Amino acid sequence: MRIAVVTQKIVRHDGQGRVNAVVVEEFLRRGHEVVAIATEVADELARHPSLRWMPVDGGGVPTQLARDQLFAWRASRALARARRAGIDRVVVNGFVSWARSDVNAVHFVHSAWMRSPTHPVRKSLSPLSLYRALYTLLNVGFERWSFRRAGRLVAVSRTVAEELRRDGIDPARLAVIDNGVDVAEFQPGKPDPTLFGLPPGRPVALFVGDARSDRKNLDGVLRALAEVPDLSLAVVGDKRGGPFPALARSLGVEERVRFLGHRRDVAALMQAADLFVFPTRYEPFGLVLLEAAASGLPVVTTRLAGASWLLEDGAAVVLDDPDAQDALVAAMRRLAADPEERRRMGEAGRRIAERHDWPVTAGRYVDLLEAMGPLASGVGLSGTLVRSTS
């Protein structure tokens, strides 16, 4: 088959981009051709003889909302050109195009985020919070429109599937394909605080995620750290313009915290840490949770992370409420003090991760496409619109 994949990034150093990259690799491994309609494609994929990259630039405009719209418009035009040349299947990721698709892989549900009690607009009516609310609400409409124009929807977790059902999506159109992990790249290692620029003598908790907003609850982690003096913290993620370095200073923990910014060596950093803390307030999946488990790290997270249910069998402390500060402090204190429990949980996490290696996950995407009828997207091979039978 000739498969068009429409998404912004097909790279390994980005959460959603990593999913796209491993799925595209599996398409190519099974002998399919791929047309990648994207802003960025990993070099090794762009050089593959069976992949054609149609670059789409979504930049040059001042806001993310405008960039998303520009990308969708340009991607739709590129897809129309690709269809004229012959396309058998179209795979998109959420709202990235105005065109129809065979499969829409859903990594985030804006309606669920809008309903969340931790959405920024419920805490503040500042201009930034109001812009984020507008961005979310508009994306609710764009996503629902895009979902209606897809033959099948793939939810990347049970959490996402439930959110889609709540929004009225017919369960018969839904498939759940949990994200996976590269167990060869993410492997257990030996803790080394000096890799983070931290002195020896204390275990290191690692946090990986956006360090500019409070959705992933870095503020809660820093406040908990202030009550666990025998623990250090390394933070990986873009912190530009974020409030958390100042919060660390105000809490008096800045000497035990290192803000490392965006890094591409996350696997090496996980090997050097002692535990992973990610008490998110909303996360449709959370690739970093499986990556931490594969690295042999005990995990502290919440039920609001889509991947949390995978780790409940002895690999994680799963909190019911991300804002239950006493419970977060207790979990961090317990793991900081007990290396034997860290070891047991890390071994359990590694066993779980090995059952979710990326080739298995990516293969399920290919199986789904290969099993679909030829007109699943409502678009014939020539690009002529027909009535969908899904």
Q: What annotation goes with each model-predicted range?
A:
Residues 208-211, 232-245:
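Glycosyltransferase donor-sugar binding loop
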Residues 262, 281:
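Aromatic "clamp/platform" in nucleotide-sugar-dependent glycosyltransferases that forms part
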Residues 144-176, 181-185:
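A short, active-site helix/loop in glycosyltransferases that binds the activated sugar's phosphate group
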Residues 101-144, 184:
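Acceptor-binding helix/loop patch of EC 2.4 sugar-transfer enzymes
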